[in-house]
């Protein structure tokens, strides 16, 4: 059965950590399964106010007791991996083992690579991502202490834009795939079949889809989604987010 999460951008009126923590607490109480945040340091117009997702996640961890939490997605190429290792372990401890780390290449179109002196070339960012994931695993395994609550590692979801295949191959080495730009459930079903063929039988692997508020999650769950997250876009009214959270998730019978 698919699990259901809330997925918000900490922008504008949602850039305030106390507001995000309050929304996360309401999500926890309303029966949702996860609360995830976009990870950006800047964004294209008309967005101006961008909250730090990692400080926000610390507040979220303290405000909740049940839901999974995490960034979706962190471009590792613009981060110092040893710092991410400390942040993720600390969040995993703070949340008692509820962190999932979403990673990907990120997108230069939002103005958060070259303007800040970061690598923009996609091939170089891909190399840095792969190396960063290997380094994270090494740090989590005990090279740096403390170690995460979750063992053998904090779950890693890898994002990639449909129909590119390289992110899919990368994701299959980790714990889940967050494909963006899917044309429909049939495309997700293809990815689910690919995952079943490539992974050992019975080994957990998440397929995550993001849907706008109100879209029927049933076809996506039937196609193989293990997580359906409600994505409000870059600047929703806080009232809309609260309304969806308070209504609770749509539970599916497959």
Regions found by a protein language model. Give the residues of each.
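Active-site-adjacent structural elements that line small-molecule/cofactor binding pockets in enzymes
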Residues: 1-254
């Amino acid at each position: 059965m698919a699990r259901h999460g809330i997925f918000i951008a900490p922008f504008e009126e949602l850039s305030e950590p106390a507001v995000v923590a309050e929304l996360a607490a309401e999500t926890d109480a309303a029966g949702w399964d996860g609360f995830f945040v976009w990870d950006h340091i800047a964004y294209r117009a008309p967005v101006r106010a961008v909250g730090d997702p990692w400080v926000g996640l610390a507040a979220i961890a303290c405000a909740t007791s049940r839901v999974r939490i995490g960034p979706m997605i962190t471009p590792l190429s613009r981060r110092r991996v040893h710092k991410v290792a400390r942040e993720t372990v600390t969040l995993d401890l703070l949340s008692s083992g509820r962190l999932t780390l979403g990673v990907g290449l990120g997108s230069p179109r939002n103005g958060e690579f070259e303007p800040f002196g970061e690598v923009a070339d996609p091939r170089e960012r891909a190399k840095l991502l792969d190396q960063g994931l290997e380094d994270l695993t090494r740090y989590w395994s005990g090279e740096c202490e403390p170690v995460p609550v979750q063992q053998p590692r904090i779950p890693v979801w890898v994002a990639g834009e449909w129909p590119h295949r390289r992110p899919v191959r990368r994701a299959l080495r980790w714990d889940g795939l967050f494909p963006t730009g899917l044309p429909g459930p049939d495309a997700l079903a293809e990815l689910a079949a690919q995952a079943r063929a490539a992974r050992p039988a019975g080994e957990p692997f998440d397929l995550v889809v993001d849907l706008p508020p109100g879209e029927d999650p049933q076809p996506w769950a039937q196609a193989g989604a293990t997580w359906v997250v409600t994505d409000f876009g870059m600047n929703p009214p806080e009232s809309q987010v609260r309304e969806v959270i308070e209504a609770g998730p749509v539970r599916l019978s497959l």
